Amino acid sequence: MSNTGTTGRIPLWLIGTFVGTAALGILAIFFYGSYVGLGSSL
């Protein structure tokens, strides 16, 4: 296996996994916050 798919010393798949997980976490927190906000306002 060659290191053509690496940026510096960090593999691209690791960056993609981290960014994807962070994006999913932010979306989950946003939807959860809006859901709780709607539930408390009703």
Swiss-Prot record:
| Compartments, as annotated in UniProt | Plastid, Chloroplast thylakoid membrane
Q: Single Gene Ontology BP term?
A: photosynthesis
- What Gene Ontology cellular-component terms does the record carry? chloroplast thylakoid membrane; photosystem II reaction center
Gene3D superfamilies reported in the protein's UniProt record? 6.10.250.2070
Note the SS bond partners.
Answer: none
Q: Which domain of life is it from?
A: Eukaryota
InterPro entries from the xrefs? PSII_PsbJ (IPR002682), PSII_PsbJ_sf (IPR037267)
Q: What is this protein's function per UniProt?
A: One of the components of the core complex of photosystem II (PSII). PSII is a light-driven water:plastoquinone oxidoreductase that uses light energy to abstract electrons from H(2)O, generating O(2) and a proton gradient subsequently used for ATP formation. It consists of a core antenna complex that captures photons, and an electron transfer chain that converts photonic excitation into a charge separation.
Recite the UniProt keywords alphabetically. Answer: Chloroplast, Membrane, Photosynthesis, Photosystem II, Plastid, Reaction center, Thylakoid, Transmembrane, Transmembrane helix
Query: What is the organism of origin for this protein?
Result: Tetradesmus obliquus
- What name does the UniProt record give this protein? Photosystem II reaction center protein J
Q: Where are the transmembrane segments?
A: 10-30
Q: How does it sit in the membrane?
A: Single-pass membrane protein
Q: Coding gene?
A: psbJ
Can you state the subunit structure given in the record? PSII is composed of 1 copy each of membrane proteins PsbA, PsbB, PsbC, PsbD, PsbE, PsbF, PsbH, PsbI, PsbJ, PsbK, PsbL, PsbM, PsbT, PsbX, PsbY, PsbZ, Psb30/Ycf12, at least 3 peripheral proteins of the oxygen-evolving complex and a large number of cofactors. It forms dimeric complexes.
**Protein family according to the UniProt entry:** Belongs to the PsbJ family.
